[in-house]
Curated annotation (Swiss-Prot):
Cofactor(s) required, per the database record: FMNH2
Organism (species): Salmonella paratyphi A (strain AKU_12601)
Residues binding FMN, per UniProt: 125-127, 238-239, 278, 293-297, 319
Keyword tags: Amino-acid biosynthesis, Aromatic amino acid biosynthesis, FAD, Flavoprotein, FMN, Lyase, NADP
Signal peptide annotation: none
BP GO terms, sorted: amino acid biosynthetic process; aromatic amino acid family biosynthetic process; chorismate biosynthetic process
Protein name: Chorismate synthase
Enzyme Commission code: 4.2.3.5
Keyword Lyase recorded: yes
Gene name linked to the record: aroC
C-alpha cells in the first residue's frame, strides 16, 4: 500500500487499522521552534471523536494523542514528529459474521480484489478511524498557519439530506452536535436523525470548509495547482464522492459576465472562484465543499455475495454513524490545513524574495 503519505515539504504519513492496537502518523517538515503540546492537538481530536453525541457512532474512544518525538521542552525541534493514538474500544466480534461476506457499498470487495485478503474488523485500513491521525497532524498545521500567518480555517455542515443549511453564524457551529451554522434548522436535523435511527438507515451530507487570511501566490501550476491539491486531499477522505471549489458545479448555469470576479480599486467584487485563480491563491477566502455519501453500514437488509460468489442477504451490525458528514467537518479542516501549510513552505522555498507592486486586499 503505497498511498499513505500526503504533501511534499509538509509531509504526513499515517498508519494503523480500525481494530488494531493503535493509530499513528509521522509528520515531517514542521519548522523548529514552534510551541507544541498534546493539548494543542486534542481540541480538534475531541471534535472528531466518536461517541460524543447520540447522533454519531457509540464506539467510545478517548482518542488521547501522544507525542512520541520531534518536540523538546515544549517546542518543535525540526525533526520528524511521531504521534500515536491507542485503540481502546474495539468490538471485533461484531464483524465475525461478515468475515466471508462483502458488505455492499464498502471497500471489502475492492480491497480483497487488490490485496488478496482484507481485515474484516471494521474495515481495517479502509475505515474512517484512520482520519483521527489526519486531524492530529492537521492541528499542527492549523496552529502554525494561525500563529505565523493569521490564517483561520473553519468548517461546517451545509446540507444533510434535502435540508440545506445557510452559513448564518460561525459561532453556532461549535454550539451544537451537527456543526451546523444555522440554528433555525437544528430541530429539522434532529427529526431527520431520529427517523433514520428508527428506520436503521443513513443519509448523505455536504460539508463546507473556508480558509481566511491566505496570502496571494500559493499554488504550483500546472499539476500541483492549489485547487487540484485541495480536491485531492478532500477526495481522499472516506465517503467523499464529490468536491467543489467556489461555485463549483453551479458555474454551469452562469454567464461569463456573472461568474468572473471583477476587480476594482477596493478589491475583488465577488468570489465565485473560491479564492483560487489559475491554480494560485488570490488572497480571498478559499472556499471548498465536499459531498459525502450515506454510509452503507445500516441495518436495512441488502443483497451481496460471499467469497464463493453465492448471493446472500445481510445487515451490517456494529456501531456506525447514521450521517458520516457530521464528524467529517474537523477532518475537512485538517486536510485543507495540511495542503495550505505544504504550499506555504513550497512558496517560501522558491519565491520568498518575490516582491510586486500589485495591490493586495
Amino acid at each position: 500500500m503505497a498511498g499513505n503519505t500526503i504533501g511534499q515539504l509538509f509531509r504526513v504519513t499515517t498508519f494503523g487499522e480500525s481494530h488494531g492496537l493503535a493509530l499513528g502518523c509521522i509528520v515531517d517538515g514542521v519548522p523548529p521552534g514552534i510551541p507544541l503540546t498534546e493539548a494543542d492537538l486534542q481540541h480538534d481530536l475531541d471534535r472528531r471523536r466518536p461517541g460524543t453525541s447520540r447522533y454519531t457512532t457509540q464506539r467510545r474512544e478517548p482518542d488521547q494523542v501522544k507525542i512520541l518525538s520531534g518536540v523538546f521542552d515544549g517546542v518543535t525541534t525540526g525533526t520528524s514528529i511521531g504521534l500515536l493514538i491507542e485503540n481502546t474500544d474495539q468490538r471485533s466480534q461484531d464483524y465475525s459474521a461478515i468475515k466471508d461476506v462483502f458488505r455492499p457499498g464498502h471497500a471489502d470487495y475492492t480491497y480483497e480484489q487488490k490485496y488478496g485478503l482484507r481485515d474484516y474488523r471494521g474495515g481495517g485500513r479502509s475505515s474512517a478511524r484512520e482520519t483521527a491521525m489526519r486531524v492530529a497532524a492537521g492541528a499542527i498545521a492549523k496552529k502554525y498557519l494561525a500563529e505565523k500567518f493569521g490564517i483561520e480555517i473553519r468548517g461546517c455542515l451545509t446540507q444533510m439530506g434535502d435540508i440545506p443549511l445557510e452559513i448564518k453564524d460561525w459561532r453556532q457551529v461549535e454550539l451544537n452536535p451537527f456543526f451546523c451554522p444555522d440554528a433555525d434548522k437544528l430541530d429539522a436535523l434532529d427529526e431527520l436523525m431520529r427517523a433514520l435511527k428508527k428506520e436503521g438507515d443513513s443519509i448523505g451530507a455536504k460539508v463546507t470548509v473556508v480558509a481566511s487570511g491566505v496570502p496571494a501566490g500559493l499554488g504550483e501550476p500546472v499539476f500541483d495547482r492549489l485547487d487540484a491539491d485541495i480536491a485531492h486531499a478532500l477526495m481522499s477522505i472516506n465517503a467523499v464522492k464529490g468536491v467543489e471549489i467556489g461555485e463549483g458545479f453551479n458555474v454551469v448555469a452562469l454567464r461569463g459576465s456573472q461568474n468572473r470576479d471583477e476587480i476594482t480599486a477596493q478589491g475583488f467584487q465577488s468570489n465565485h472562484a473560491g479564492g483560487i485563480l489559475g491554480g494560485i491563491s488570490s488572497g480571498q477566502h478559499i472556499v471548498a465543499h465536499m459531498a459525502l455519501k450515506p454510509t452503507s453500514s445500516i441495518t436495512v437488509p441488502g443483497r451481496t455475495i460471499n467469497r464463493m460468489g453465492e448471493e446472500v442477504e445481510m445487515i451490517t451490525k456494529g456501531r456506525h454513524d447514521p450521517c458520516v458528514g457530521i464528524r467529517a467537518v474537523p477532518i475537512a479542516e485538517a486536510m485543507l490545513a495540511i495542503v495550505l501549510m505544504d504550499h506555504l513552505l513550497r512558496h517560501r522555498a522558491q519565491n520568498a524574495d518575490v516582491k510586486t507592486e500589485i495591490p493586495r486586499w
